[in-house]
Amino acid sequence: MAQLYFYYSAMNAGKSTALLQSSYNYQERGMRTVVYTAEIDDRFGAGKVSSRIGLSSPAKLFNQNTSLFEEIRAESVRQTIHCVLVDESQFLTRQQVYQLSEVVDKLDIPVLCYGLRTDFRGELFVGSQYLLAWSDKLVELKTICFCGRKASMVLRLDQDGRPYNEGEQVVIGGNERYVSVCRKHYKDALEEGSLTAIQERHRHI
């Protein structure tokens, strides 16, 4: 019986790598997968899921107007789909998460979603909120803070490398703009207005 999975984490935990590995595992057994990623995230080029270790795969794009259930149903009529995988799933709308649950419940196709749990303010993305609420299986992918603790928060840095927690929720960027840290160092960095100073002190402990 198909299920809806949500693999969530902070940044740089290997979400895209895990997605690509899962897709490959299906394909290796002669099964067909359909991969989606957010149109808004074009850091590695549009229509592609790429990992930091160099793996990549073509992907269909979704935006807030994409009817995922209708697209996937039409595609499955043309050729059997054995699994749907969605990268950057934090950018899904509430309705799109519901549509993916319909893919599972009505089409009996497993759906694996990969995304961030919270934004740079420590607040849930809409897509993540409903995936956490409606998924059959929740899996946390772990990464670590510079101190060695589990990194569960994401700091946004300005052009001078200073952390801040105001502004638009979505600003696309990679390591130069976002850093995954533990909750303690997330709060410390915002209070001090500097992540670098905290990292330097930690090195000398």
Swiss-Prot record:
Keywords: ATP-binding, Cytoplasm, DNA synthesis, Kinase, Metal-binding, Nucleotide-binding, Transferase, Zinc
EC number per UniProt: 2.7.1.21
Record: active site: E88
A Gene Ontology biological process term: thymidine metabolic process
Chain sites annotated for binding Zn(2+): C145, C147, C182, H185
Quaternary state and interactors: Homotetramer.
Protein name, per record: Thymidine kinase
Gene: tdk
